[in-house]
Design a protein with these regions (language model features):
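Long, polar/Ser/Thr-enriched low-complexity segments
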Residues: 1-126
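Charged linear interaction tracts used for macromolecular binding and regulation
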Residues: 75-235
Length: 235
């Protein structure tokens, strides 16, 4: 990585531009160029790329007056990456593409209308159960913090990894999973078909690592990521 050296014009850099991403370590900033692996994309990665291309194509068809609304709403949104000091904001295209991806994930792909980003209620997610049903891993999650919100508009969406009990995150595949129902249903269930083949798993006790967000079914937006790790013993 190349170290970034501050100057009188630019004191620091954050986020990504093109194939370069800024990383901060021990008070220093480094610029790392994104690697471009030679191996082909997985089927899931190729599908995700196609959705992204459709989102960008849809954005190009949005009238200029509507783009101005998206840009105005985007300036009110705190980015999901640092700095978290209100000194930076999203573009209207960022917000539009985020909503497009969200609706696609929820099974309702369409061109979204410009809507203000509503702050998500503070919430916490905890793994509370795990069972195997006809070769499917059914994970039960409890979601706290939505007691005074309309929980039916929020859906849990997570990237999950299963490894040997007690192990940290490794090279095992990550599986993206949308909950079987909204957060108004308790427990919230995330179901992984053929999970033993996905993770080459023979044990009934394992470590689950995850990154989860809430998706808002009204506007397609997503919350900040919550990371979790839990020991799961199948019942």
């Amino acid at each position: 990585m190349t170290r970034f050296r501050p100057n009188i014009v630019v004191s620091d850099v954050f986020g990504s531009a093109g194939d370069v991403t800024a990383h901060h370590r021990d008070g220093k900033t480094y610029l790392r160029k994104r690697s471009r692996p030679v191996h082909p994309m997985t089927e899931a990665q190729a599908a995700h790329l196609e959705v992204h291309r459709r989102a960008l194509a849809a954005w190009r068809e949005v009238p200029d007056t509507e783009k101005e609304r998206w840009n105005a709403y985007a300036r009110e949104v705190e980015p999901h990456r640092p700095p978290f000091d209100h000194s930076s904001w999203l573009s209207g295209q960022n917000l539009f593409v985020s909503a497009y991806h969200g609706f696609f994930t929820l099974g309702h792909e369409h061109v979204p209308e410009a809507q203000r980003f509503e702050k998500f209620p503070p919430f916490a997610v905890k793994v509370c159960s795990g069972v195997e049903v006809e070769g499917k891993l059914v994970l039960g999650f409890s979601v706290a913090g939505l007691e005074y919100a309309d929980a039916s508009r929020y859906w849990v969406y997570g990237k999950l990894q299963v490894v040997m009990a007690g192990a940290g995150k490794g090279n095992a595949p990550w599986k993206s999973v949308l909950a079987a129902g909204p957060c108004s249903v308790s427990p919230v269930e995330l179901i992984v078909p053929n999970w033993r083949e996905v993770w080459d798993m023979d044990w009934d006790s394992f470590q689950l690592h995850g990154q989860v967000v809430l998706l808002d079914a009204l506007n397609g937006y997503r919350s900040q990521k919550h990371r979790l790790s839990a020991l799961v013993e199948l019942k």
